UniProtKB/Swiss-Prot annotation:
Top-level lineage group: Bacteria
One GO biological process term: D-glucarate catabolic process
Descriptive protein name: Alpha-ketoglutaric semialdehyde dehydrogenase 2
Keyword Oxidoreductase on entry: yes
Biological role: Catalyzes the NAD(P)(+)-dependent oxidation of alpha-ketoglutaric semialdehyde (alphaKGSA) to alpha-ketoglutarate. Involved in D-glucarate/D-galactarate metabolism. Prefers NAD(+) to NADP(+) as a cosubstrate.
Keywords linked to the UniProt accession: NAD, NADP, Oxidoreductase
EC nos: 1.2.1.26
Pathway: Carbohydrate acid metabolism; D-glucarate degradation; Carbohydrate acid metabolism; galactarate degradation
GO molecular function annotations of the record: 2,5-dioxovalerate dehydrogenase (NADP+) activity
Enzyme class: oxidoreductase
Catalytic residues in the record: E266, C303
Residues annotated to bind NAD(+): K185, E188, G242, S243, R244, Q245, G246, G247, E394
Stimuli inducing this protein: Induced by D-glucarate and D-galactarate.
Amino acid sequence: MQLTGEMLIGAEAVAGSAGTLRAFDPSKGEPIDAPVFGVAAQADVERACELARDAFDAYRAQPLAARAAFLEAIADEIVALGDALIERAHAETGLPVARLQGERGRTVGQLRLFARVVRDGRFLAASIDPAQPARTPLPRSDLRLQKVGLGPVVVFGASNFPLAFSVAGGDTASALAAGCPVIVKAHEAHLGTSELVGRAIRAAVAKTGMPAGVFSLLVGPGRVIGGALVSHPAVQAVGFTGSRQGGMALVQIANARPQPIPVYAEMSSINPVVLFPAALAARGDAIATGFVDSLTLGVGQFCTNPGLVLAIDGPDLDRFETVAAQALAKKPAGVMLTQGIADAYRNGRGKLAELPGVREIGAGEAAQTDCQAGGALYEVGAQAFLAEPAFSHEVFGPASLIVRCRDLDEVARVLEALEGQLTATLQMDADDKPLARRLLPVLERKAGRLLVNGYPTGVEVCDAMVHGGPFPATSNPAVTSVGATAIERFLRPVCYQDFPDDLLPEGLQESNPLAIPRLRDGKAE
């Protein structure tokens, strides 16, 4: 498929007229010559939003089977892009080919997961409370509930996952599954990859006969184009993965609208790892090497990167640090996604190293180019950590901080001082269970996913996954951005009272022609 640098607005390919952008190859440290990508003008934003608004009712009225087939068609079209997609993503991100192949599998897998969710119909949460005309002292009306899509959704592609959290990523897949048209703001770090995937979606739209306005792809600076999209009255929700600053800027814009809308922003997390005494004594070396592998995976560019380690002071922790430092020293520097991310990592690492009481205990191989970064491991005492809020700030990249605590009570105090997190990990053995049980209440308050004897950098796409957490991990701790229940972000309930049966949505009619799971008087039918 030939790249053109055009945006996709409904069924049309449009050359942006408000400026130009070029893709960048971080491995070579130079721009990619062709194509040049045109930036959206305000008229392009208006057109995409109007098309999405006009497509909403027609799209959500599609049979569930047709909606599911559309999602599967998107997956098929992405696979059909073949090596061209992987090659372009590799050029734009520096990510290894094997990693990108795996990410493509994850991307099409979650599209097919949501197709299954749509076909099953359980997401509609259909519930029926039949009329009770003879009830005293007052009769009860016939009441039936079903969820419907919110309306057009704006999705911001993430820098660190050019496929799985981008144009056809989890936000787009779950919004389309909910019956919502999607407008994607392409991330500037992978413009060509975004165009390829956008064209795959557009091909699926045409093949399945969906309304043209169900999908658009715009290009431009996030602050300008993003602000215009979130402000537009047709837009009813936002999906975002990125920095705390960027996410909160969108939240403020959304809240300032005459009609505020939800922004589901995944932002900042340092993902604490607690090393319990028995586990540290029995297998500290293995934990240390596994931790370093997780820390440096993808040059640390995961929102679930283990950026904080808590442990009780003693010889076993000394050995853990020694082994971790030795393992880190063998790790080569890697190419980060963009020059800006690499610069921010160096800046954040420098600030962390200058905080009171910090000691560097290990480092990976030094960077050889401006877009490369090496790992770093630091140590600080719990009292110093508690005295300085800046220790809780995320350093996006392969850097982590070990906090030495006097006892479990001090571990608990450090955990209490943390902001909300995506994950918290417990490295423990059977003898550690009483200590782990004492920390569970605070861990449950702080994080969306709790792990035992694993590492947080893997996020499975499945029904039970939670990729979310209290602020600032996300802007809304009640939902997840990964897994089947991510669809809940883009739905709202509607109650139908005393409706004629043939005027009800099919899922609420007495004969249940969709054969979806339902509750009747609070019990499964």
